[in-house]
């Protein structure tokens, strides 16, 4: 038996949607031992395949920051919470954090929350941290 010394690395996520996809791809490729398959344009298709095959665990590694009105119309989501404004949907989600400032709800969540709830359209609300 070979004993491995435990270790970890902190990977800072790059900004924007591309940064989310690249962060998830990096974690997923380590999980699948396929780091050598990363290319400049492989992140998004890799993540889309994970979503399509319902392998959503790795999506938790992609932090998503959204900015939306504290109250208002839904952003085209599907599912049981679709009738709720985006901010309220995330307030009711235990894997999301919402901070209201001057009528704007700043949401911190992860891509798994969006994918599993049919809220991928909310990526139009993407904001910086």
Predicted regions and their residues:
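A conserved ligand/cofactor-binding region detector
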Residues: 1-129
